[in-house]
C-alpha cells in the first residue's frame, strides 16, 4: 500500500514538532502498552507500520507513562556517563574522538570502535562487533539534556545512515524492553577473540569499565 503522502514518525521526533493535522506512519513497538491493535488496524510497509493521525500521535506521546513503562524505566536505570554528542554529526572521526576522550573504554571496545571506523562499509560481516559496541554504549552512555537523541544521531552518522545498522541502534537504545549487555570478558577473549588483555580490566564485563 502506498505511503508517499504520509510522514514516517521516529522516536527522535518530539511531540511539540508534530503536525496534528497530518497523518503519520508509526512502528507499534514504540508504543507498547499504549497502542491497542485490532483486526481493523491497517498495516503499511509490509506489516511493519500503522497509520495514525497527528493528533492521536500527539496524545500518545504526551500521555502519562503506564505502570509497565515506569517499572521498565526503573529497571533500566543505572549509573552512566552523561555525555552530549550533539556536535558529533559530521562523520565517524568526531564520534570516535568523543568516546575516546570522555570514556575510559576497555581495550576490546577500543579495538571494535577502531575496526568499525576503518571499515568503509558499515556491514561487511561486522554485525557481532556492532552489536557489542552498541550494547556497551547503551549501558554506559546517556544524555539527560537531549534524552539520548544526540547519541542516536551520532551513531546514525557513524554507521553512514545504513538502514539496517540504524535499526539495530534504535532497537537497542529505544525499543528493547531490556538493556542487553555485551558478552562477558571470558567470552570476549575465548569466543569473540577480541580481548587482548584478559584479567587487566575491572569487573567481569566490558561495561564495568567507563
UniProtKB/Swiss-Prot annotation:
Q: What does this protein do?
A: Plays an essential role in viral DNA replication. Does not seem to participate in the initiation step but is rather important for the amplification of DNA. Also required for expression from the vp39 and polh promoters.
Q: What is its main location?
A: virion
Could you provide one GO biological process annotation from this protein's UniProt record?
Answer: viral genome replication
Q: What is this protein called?
A: Primase-associated factor LEF-2
User: Which Pfam families does its entry note?
Assistant: Baculo_LEF-2 (PF03041)
Query: Does the keyword Iron-sulfur feature in the UniProt annotation?
Result: no
Q: Where in the cell is it found?
A: Virion; Host nucleus; Host cytoplasm
Q: Name one GO cellular component term.
A: host cell cytoplasm
How does the annotation summarize its subunit structure? Interacts with the DNA primase.
Q: Which organism is it from?
A: Autographa californica nuclear polyhedrosis virus
Similarity comment: family membership: Belongs to the baculoviridae LEF-2 family.
Keyword tags: Capsid protein, Host cytoplasm, Host nucleus, Transcription, Transcription regulation, Virion
Amino acid at each position: 500500500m502506498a505511503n508517499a503522502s504520509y510522514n514516517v514518525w521516529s522516536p527522535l521526533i518530539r511531540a511539540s514538532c508534530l503536525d496534528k493535522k497530518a497523518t503519520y506512519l508509526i512502528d507499534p513497538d514504540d508504543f507498547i502498552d499504549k497502542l491497542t491493535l485490532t483486526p481493523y488496524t491497517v498495516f503499511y510497509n509490509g506489516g511493519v507500520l500503522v497509520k495514525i493521525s497527528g493528533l492521536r500521535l500527539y496524545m500518545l506521546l504526551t500521555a502519562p507513562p503506564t505502570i509497565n513503562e515506569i517499572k521498565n524505566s526503573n529497571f533500566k536505570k543505572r549509573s552512566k556517563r552523561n555525555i552530549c554528542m550533539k556536535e558529533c554529526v559530521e562523520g565517524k572521526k568526531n564520534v570516535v574522538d568523543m568516546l575516546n576522550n570522555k570514556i575510559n573504554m576497555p581495550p576490546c571496545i577500543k579495538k571494535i570502535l577502531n575496526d568499525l571506523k576503518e571499515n568503509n562499509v558499515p556491514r561487511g560481516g561486522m554485525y557481532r562487533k556492532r552489536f557489542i559496541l552498541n550494547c556497551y554504549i547503551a549501558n554506559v552512555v546517556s544524555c539527560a539534556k537531549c534524552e539520548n537523541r544526540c547519541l542516536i544521531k551520532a551513531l546514525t552518522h557513524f554507521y553512514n545512515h545504513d538502514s539496517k545498522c540504524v535499526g539495530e541502534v534504535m532497537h537497542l537504545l529505544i525499543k528493547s524492553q531490556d538493556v542487553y549487555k555485551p558478552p562477558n570478558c571470558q567470552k570476549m577473549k575465548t569466543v569473540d577473540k577480541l580481548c587482548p588483555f584478559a584479567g587487566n580490566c575491572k569487573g567481569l564485563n566490558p561495561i564495568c569499565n567507563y
